């Protein structure tokens, strides 16, 4: 009896953790990790090189630019 109750409680906890993360938010994170814009600092992902974000796209920095404007 205790094993059944424990199994039900564990199943409920796992389901609540899965339901807490919306599918659209997880998809957005995977797109950002592939080189999209990082809104907190306006730079693109480090893997995409020295680029700034312009809207939702990454643009190349010139040799003289060291920060992202705007």
UniProtKB/Swiss-Prot annotation:
Molecular function GO terms recorded = toxin activity
Tissue and organ distribution: Expressed by the venom gland.
The set of disulfide-linked cysteines is 37-53, 44-58, 52-68
Please list the residues that carry the modification Leucine amide. 69
* Pfam families the UniProt entry points to: Toxin_7
Asked whether the keyword Secreted is assigned, the reply is yes
**Signal peptide annotation:** 1-20
Task: Report if keyword Secreted is assigned.
Answer: yes
Major location category of this protein: secreted
Keyword field? Amidation, Disulfide bond, Knottin, Neurotoxin, Secreted, Signal, Toxin
Role this protein plays: Insect active toxin causing rapid but reversible paralysis in crickets. No activity shown in mammals. Does not show effect on mammalian voltage-gated calcium channels.
Q: What is known of its domains?
A: The presence of a 'disulfide through disulfide knot' structurally defines this protein as a knottin.
Q: What is the similarity comment for this entry?
A: Belongs to the neurotoxin 01 (U2-agtx) family.
Q: What is this protein called?
A: U2-agatoxin-Ao1p
The organism encoding this protein is: Agelena orientalis (Funnel-web spider)
